Amino acid sequence: MLIIELLKALFLGVVEGVTEWLPVSSTGHLILVQEFMKLNQSKSFVEMFNIVIQLGAIMAVIVIYFKRLNPFQPGKSAREIRLTWQLWLKVVIACIPSILIALPFDNWFEAHFNFMIPIAIALIFYGFVFIWVEKRNAHLKPQVTELASMSYKTAFLIGCFQVLSIVPGTSRSGATILGAIIIGTSRSVAADFTFFLAIPTMFGYSGLKAVKYFLDGNVLSLDQSLILLVASLTAFVVSLYVIRFLTDYVKRHDFTIFGKYRIVLGSLLILYWLVVHLF
């Protein structure tokens, strides 16, 4: 029934809106949730759905930061306009590694790692990395405390870390936040740059997935269009709250709790897999 599918889409939109911005892997969570609550749709649609609903989450970034990201915003001084253009240049530079490395190998990684055990291992591994990085940085002062003072080299290096998220379960936001903190930015700068970098990265990735879906001869039925719309709108609304929560959270806390969450979730997934396949 369509109503059941729409309720599933609503729930998956909530999952996307929450996990896209927290360093816990949104795609990994969507895949895992659908292990227990599958959309009754074709495999090709579900694969496209898991990526394209990220557009809803991205629109939340644009809405929240529109004035900051718009170089043509009325009232901006010449310096503010220059800094806005410099920010966009840093974002473009940070996209280069993904274009050169991640894009050509995306299909291969999706085919070989888009399963429960690889996702669980990635969750656990980067969970420990988060805990280690936060312990290492506990008594260190960040070298970059404002986006305006971030160098183009730093932006490029953060983009290199983003490439790690090609492995399902890694988390795009988690990889860029980790990379930024390791390089020496504050948590606030790491989070903000992660939000901004998501705009071209996820628009491009979602667009490519959608184009590939249609080039493969698929079409969207009315029901599928509604499912995609409901999930995307839900992801947008939820993201508005989660982005504001995270920007406030990182001012007073570190990311250790997310590392612990990843380890617990990954361990439970491995246990579940063992029970299902061995007993």
From Swiss-Prot:
InterPro entries: UppP
Primary enzyme class: hydrolase
Membrane topology reported for the UniProt record: Multi-pass membrane protein
Catalytic reaction equation(s): di-trans,octa-cis-undecaprenyl diphosphate + H2O = di-trans,octa-cis-undecaprenyl phosphate + phosphate + H(+)
Transmembrane segments: 45-65, 85-105, 113-133, 188-208, 226-246, 255-275
GO molecular function annotation: undecaprenyl-diphosphatase activity
Entry's EC annotation: 3.6.1.27
GO annotation, biological process: cell wall organization; peptidoglycan biosynthetic process; regulation of cell shape; response to antibiotic
A Gene Ontology term for the protein's cellular component: plasma membrane
Keyword field: Antibiotic resistance, Cell membrane, Cell shape, Cell wall biogenesis/degradation, Hydrolase, Membrane, Peptidoglycan synthesis, Transmembrane, Transmembrane helix
UniProt-annotated location(s): Cell membrane
Miscellaneous note of the record: Bacitracin is thought to be involved in the inhibition of peptidoglycan synthesis by sequestering undecaprenyl diphosphate, thereby reducing the pool of lipid carrier available.
Family of this protein: Belongs to the UppP family.
Biological role stated in the UniProt entry: Catalyzes the dephosphorylation of undecaprenyl diphosphate (UPP). Confers resistance to bacitracin.
Alphabetized NCBIfam families for the sequence: PRK00281.1-5 (NF001391)
Protein name, entry field: Undecaprenyl-diphosphatase
The species this protein was found in: Streptococcus agalactiae serotype V (strain ATCC BAA-611 / 2603 V/R)
Upper taxonomic lineage: Bacteria, Bacillati, Bacillota, Bacilli, Lactobacillales
